[in-house]
From Swiss-Prot:
Its main location: cytoplasm. It comes from the Bacteria. Keywords: Cytoplasm, Ribosome biogenesis. Belongs to the RbfA family. InterPro entries: KH_dom-like_a/b, RbfA, RbfA_dom_sf, Ribosome-bd_factorA_CS. Monomer. Binds 30S ribosomal subunits, but not 50S ribosomal subunits or 70S ribosomes. It comes from Kosmotoga olearia (strain ATCC BAA-1733 / DSM 21960 / TBF 19.5.1). This is Ribosome-binding factor A.
Length: 125
């Protein structure tokens, strides 16, 4: 149980460090780093790899650019993690686009359409 707790705490700390690193980013970028959100982090059991799911306030093309931005600056973010969190070795960071928000919106829209269709059927009968 304590190993799971430690993993969850490390994931939370990494999320905080990366959010702060995004806020303080000084390099050039096509996107605004302050609009990038770290949605969730999945740390591997051996803590060597961290899958980081990011979201960006913008269209699909901008979201892909946000993931590319994170990948291009992977060293900067890994250094931030290494400096701020006591670990034997900083995990390798792997960035992915988070589709959870879009998927939930799509599902709710589908459910609303089904509800409308059912109401129309009841009215017609």
């Amino acid at each position: 149980m304590s190993a799971g707790y430690r993993k969850a705490m490390l994931e939370s700390e990494i999320q905080k460090v990366l959010t702060e690193a995004l806020r303080n980013f000084k390099g050039e970028s096509e996107i605004d780093p302050t609009l990038v959100s770290i949605v969730r982090i999945e740390l591997s059991k051996d803590k060597r790899y961290a899958n980081i799911f990011v979201s960006y306030l913008g269209n699909d093309e901008e979201k892909k650019k946000a993931v590319e931005f994170m990948e291009e600056n992977k060293g900067y973010f890994r250094t931030a993690v290494a400096k701020n969190i006591r670990l034997f070795k900083a995990p390798e960071l792997r960035f992915h686009e988070d589709i959870g928000i879009e998927a939930s919106l799509r599902i709710s829209k589908i459910l609303e359409e089904i509800k409308k269709q059912e109401q129309e059927k009841e009215e017609n009968e």
